[in-house]
């Protein structure tokens, strides 16, 4: 599954970044900093999906060793399924800066359980939106998503430079 996802551009070029949780951790730090929280990746309670010692292997060796985790993950999947739940790798951040990333069982009717393929979801719970949180859901990986993100960033830079009039970036 991981090799297929990598070939389709749904993982980082080095899938260890995804399976270790570090890609999610960096994104969670960005979100935290937007909330004026002073955290870094070391402050996150991070549960990797695979043993860290695999990170010393080459990418090809790593992908080959992942097969050793199939039965363990299948057992977790079946355990969750018996409880009418699914497994999701979930990042959580609260207003005090407490951050966690781990594999969790979620009810099959939960919004996280409804994701397909490379979709991502973020749920914002605030004082105003506690009973009915704000939900943003959409594609989270792949070449077209990355390209549109870069294009959006370029538009933002262009608008900011236009406001500064006369200043340019080379």
Regions found by a protein language model. Give the residues of each.
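Catalytic, metal-anchored helix/loop core of enzyme active sites in primary metabolism
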Residues: 4, 9-10, 92-170
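Substrate-binding/catalytic subdomain of NAD(P)-dependent oxidoreductase enzymes
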Residues: 1-114
């Amino acid at each position: 599954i991981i090799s297929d996802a990598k070939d389709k551009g749904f993982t980082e070029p080095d899938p260890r970044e995804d399976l270790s949780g570090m890609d999610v951790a960096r994104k969670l730090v960005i979100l935290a900093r937007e909330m004026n929280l002073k955290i870094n990746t070391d402050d996150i309670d991070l549960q990797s999906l695979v043993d860290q010692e695999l990170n010393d292997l080459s990418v090809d060796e790593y992908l080959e060793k992942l097969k050793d985790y199939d039965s363990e993950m299948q057992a977790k999947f079946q355990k969750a399924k018996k409880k009418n739940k699914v497994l999701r790798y979930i990042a959580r951040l609260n207003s005090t800066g407490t951050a966690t990333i781990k594999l969790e069982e979620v009810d099959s009717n939960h919004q996280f359980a409804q994701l397909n393929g490379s979709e991502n979801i973020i749920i914002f719970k605030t004082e105003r939106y506690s009973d009915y949180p704000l939900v943003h859901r959409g594609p989270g990986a792949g070449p077209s998503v990355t390209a549109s993100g870069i294009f959006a960033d370029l538009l933002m830079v262009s608008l900011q430079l236009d406001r500064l009039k006369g200043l340019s970036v080379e």
